[in-house]
UniProtKB/Swiss-Prot annotation:
<dbReference type="Pfam" id="PF00008">
    <property type="entry name" value="EGF"/>
</dbReference>
<feature type="binding site">
    <location>
        <position position="165"/>
    </location>
    <ligand>
        <name>Zn(2+)</name>
    </ligand>
</feature>
<keyword id="KW-1133">Transmembrane helix</keyword>
<feature type="disulfide bond">
    <location>
        <begin position="679"/>
        <end position="694"/>
    </location>
</feature>
<dbReference type="GO" id="GO:0140448">
    <property type="term" value="P:signaling receptor ligand precursor processing"/>
</dbReference>
<feature type="glycosylation site" description="N-linked (GlcNAc...) asparagine">
    <location>
        <position position="258"/>
    </location>
</feature>
<keyword id="KW-0654">Proteoglycan</keyword>
<feature type="disulfide bond">
    <location>
        <begin position="269"/>
        <end position="431"/>
    </location>
</feature>
<keyword id="KW-0812">Transmembrane</keyword>
<dbReference type="InterPro" id="IPR001506">
    <property type="entry name" value="Peptidase_M12A"/>
</dbReference>
<dbReference type="GO" id="GO:0008270">
    <property type="term" value="F:zinc ion binding"/>
</dbReference>
<dbReference type="GO" id="GO:0070062">
    <property type="term" value="C:extracellular exosome"/>
</dbReference>
<feature type="disulfide bond">
    <location>
        <begin position="107"/>
        <end position="259"/>
    </location>
</feature>
<keyword id="KW-0865">Zymogen</keyword>
<keyword id="KW-0645">Protease</keyword>
<keyword id="KW-1015">Disulfide bond</keyword>
<feature type="glycosylation site" description="N-linked (GlcNAc...) asparagine">
    <location>
        <position position="539"/>
    </location>
</feature>
Length: 746
């Protein structure tokens, strides 16, 4: 009966091999924190909850209102500012982060207050609001509870710079529909338009993507029905974006202040022009870099990724011929820094021998005025990954300099490619501390269920703290969204570091890979670690304590990770696919973790006058007052008793030409997305702002996952019991057969 024994051994070998290969997914019921303790809200929601009824929702006006057209309301740069100490530490850090966006993308600059008569003081009042233009006194911007997000702060600063909301333009009704009967009673004034005596479009088109545009559900009665929709339905998911400035926002800002230069962008090159951005070839090297286009088979640039015929250029250094150690130099023009630190970002790929090298150098002033002193900064080695990669190199130049790329051949006989460069950006900003690239993200998104997660590598900040991010491609809490969360990791420096680690600001960014950094609309979130971040899962201990004490051990990093703290609705899948977030199907995540304890006390005494919120105009009762000779109607405000006083409702006539109530005018928001129920397997459909979100059922043995509850999975413990029980029965059966087969025949 040797064949029976062999069969048994083979069967169980295959059985246990199969069990080891089957991925048993388990969704841990851990305590999940949300950085803002709930869903991120927009300005109108925050101000409504605070009981505020302001002009256009978030603007305070003086009695003698000056409009955007008045040149006397223009600021002189840099704008003096004060961060009041009633602001939270996280809000202060977020404001400074927003300042950097203005400096990088526009001519706007800020400086600490030093006794000037005109300045902005950022304070925490109720809600998010600002005044419009320079009032020539100290004036307020409120960053209240829930307002400490980069895009919201940028929005309020744009008001202070002189901008009203996009949908207040005179020609608004040509581009969007206002559904007056869906607006909260008494808040219709927020949707008024204003004539050219108050607002100018600066000769730019209507901008659906403007940071100053209302969101579809602003001031709505019904949570699932919008108040404003685009006449081109494709823009309904775009209006009210809260990522960053749009290209037209920046164009208007530059036109208003008659400037085009930025403060922290030193150099930028996509190699689309024949002059290769003023870069020069080395004269003492062995060969040159070649300016190539994407027309050749298999050669695709990073800027356009081969999407445009006859366009898409890059620099290439071939390493497939010649001799080992032959090199080529590519040098930038001479650059003049204003700060003491720069970040050189570029995309590169190496398709030749693993021994090929790409070296970044700087050429400095030799103290005689000649830029000739060479210093090696960083080396990149060839490998088996032939994809485009992002790189960051920290430079610390205080005088004029050039940066150089040196390509060196490693083993030409075993090379079939070379070294490629594209999309170079040099800024006077810090480089991101942690950079994580998730490749083939569309496939990752398709193959993961709600709650499945990916862990980043461990990064270290300048203090020596280990940290990382957790990516949930399909957020368990918010259907159709991606979740990102932060954690600290145990590391080699833990014994000498301070625990719990508090007052460190976390900035997580999903990179919009638009080649021009000024036009990037990356998605960023911030929070600051605090002793108030505790968890019942660890006996209400601070989650930022030493990870080896309060964290969980993970074999992939051979380290302990703390509980995650993050955002369940970091960015929607729809938005991810809209811009260049997934260029080359790569999701690129930046994460920073820096000490901002020094911002604890920032308020300074002031001189002269400062506006008080109680002395300003809110949206009051309105009277139609005809302007002589214009036939236009303007609003007359009345001063309320207090800042939070509500206003009486009024009847508002509908705008003309909004169109009949037909299907082509009413987007999907107006149809109940849960009728019919799109959820499978008895899933419950919930209408979340006009979008269907499925709540999948879960039993003792099985649970359903997927965006429509279409996938069934078995709880890991039950599956183990089933497999173990089945294996036991089979083993017992074969054992009985083997015993019976060995009994002597009569």
């Amino acid at each position: 009966m040797a064949w029976i024994r062999s069969t048994c051994i083979l069967f169980f070998t295959l059985l246990f091999a199969h069990i080891a290969a089957v991925p048993i997914k388990y969704l841990p019921e851990e305590n999940v924190h949300d950085a803002d303790f709930g869903e991120q809200k927009d300005i109108s929601e925050i101000n409504l909850a605070a009981g505020l009824d302001l002009f256009q929702g978030d603007i305070l006006l003086q009695k003698s209102r000056n409009g955007l057209r008045d040149p006397n309301t223009r600021w002189t740069f840099p704008i003096p500012y004060i961060l009041a100490d009633n602001l939270g530490l996280n809000a202060k850090g977020a404001i400074l982060y927003a300042f950097e966006m203005f400096r990088l993308k526009s001519c706007v600059d800020f400086k600490p207050y030093e006794g000037e008569s005109s300045y902005i003081i950022f304070q925490q009042f109720d809600g998010c609001w600002s005044e419009v233009g320079d009032q020539h006194v100290g004036q307020n911007i409120s960053i209240g509870q829930g307002c400490a997000y980069k895009a919201i702060i940028e929005h309020e600063i744009l008001h202070a710079l002189g901008f009203y909301h996009e949908q207040s333009r005179t020609d608004r009704d040509d581009y969007v529909n206002i559904w007056w009967d869906q607006i909260l009673s008494g808040y219709q004034h927020n949707f008024d338009t204003y004539d050219d005596s108050l607002i100018t479009d600066l000769n730019t088109p209507y901008d659906y993507e403007s940071l100053m545009h209302y969101q579809p559900f602003s001031f709505n009665k019904n949570a699932s029905v919008p108040t404003i929709t685009a006449k081109i339905p494709e823009f309904n998911s775009i209006i009210g974006q809260r990522l960053d400035f749009s290209a037209i926002d920046l164009e208007r800002l530059n036109r208003m202040y008659n400037c085009t230069t930025t403060h922290t962008l030193l150099d930028h090159c996509t190699f689309e022009k024949a002059n290769i951005c003023g870069m020069i070839q080395g004269t003492r090297d062995d060969t040159d870099w070649a300016h190539q286009d994407s027309a050749q088979a298999g050669e695709v640039d990073h800027t356009l990724l081969g999407q445009c015929t006859g366009a898409g250029y890059f620099m290439q250094f071939s390493t497939s011929s010649g001799s080992a150690e032959e090199a080529a130099l590519l040098e930038s023009r001479i650059l003049y820094p204003k700060r003491k630190q720069q970040c050189l970002q570029f995309f590169y790929k190496m398709t030749g021998s693993p021994s090929d090298r790409l070296v970044v150098w700087v050429r400095r002033d030799d103290s005689t005025g000649n830029v000739r002193k060479l210093v090696k900064v960083q080396t990149f080695q060839g490998d088996d990954d032939h994809n485009w990669k992002i790189a960051h190199v920290v430079l610390k130049e205080e005088q004029k300099f050039r940066y150089l790329f040196q390509g060196t051949k490693g083993d030409p006989q075993n090379s079939t490619g070379g070294i490629y460069l594209d999309d170079i950006t040099l800024t006077e900003t810090p480089c991101p501390t942690g950079v994580w690239t998730v490749r083939n993200f569309s496939q990752v998104l398709e193959n993961t269920s709600k709650g499945d997660k990916l862990q980043s590598p461990r990064f270290y900040n300048s203090e020596g703290y280990g940290f990382g991010v957790t990516l949930y491609p399909n957020s368990r809490e918010s259907s159709g969204y991606l979740r990102l969360a932060f954690h600290v990791c145990s590391g080699e420096n833990d014994a000498i570091l301070e625990w719990p680690v508090e007052n460190r600001q976390v900035i997580i960014t999903i990179l919009d890979q638009e080649p021009d950094v000024r036009n990037r609309m990356s998605s960023s979130m911030v929070f600051t670690t605090s002793k108030s971040h505790t968890s019942p899962a660890i006996n209400d201990t601070v989650i930022w304590d030493r990870p080896s004490r309060v964290g969980t051990y993970h074999t992939d990093c051979n380290c302990f990770r703390s509980i995650d703290l993050g955002w369940s609705g970091f960015i929607s899948h729809q938005m991810l696919k809209r811009r260049s977030f997934l260029k080359n199907d790569d999701l690129i995540i930046f994460v920073d973790f820096e000490d901002i304890t020094h911002l604890s006390q920032t308020e300074v005494p002031t001189k002269g006058k400062r506006l008080s919120p109680q002395g300003l105009i809110l949206q009051g009762q309105e009277q139609q007052v005809s302007e002589e000779g214009s036939g236009k109607a303007m609003l007359e405000e009345a001063l309320p008793v207090s800042l939070s006083q509500g206003q009486p409702s009024r009847q508002k006539r509908s705008v003309e030409n909004t169109g009949p109530l037909e299907d082509h005018n009413w987007p999907q928001y107006f149809r109940d997305p849960c009728d019919p129920n799109p959820c499978q397997n008895d899933g419950i459909c919930v209408n979340v702002k006009g979008m269907a979100s499925c709540r999948c059922i879960s039993g003792h043995a099985f649970f359903y996952t997927g965006e429509r509850c279409q996938a069934v999975q078995v709880h890991g413990s039950v599956l183990g019991m089933v497999i173990g029980g089945t294996a036991g029965v089979i083993f017992l059966t074969f054992s009985i057969i083997a015993i019976l087969s060995q009994r002597p025949r009569k």
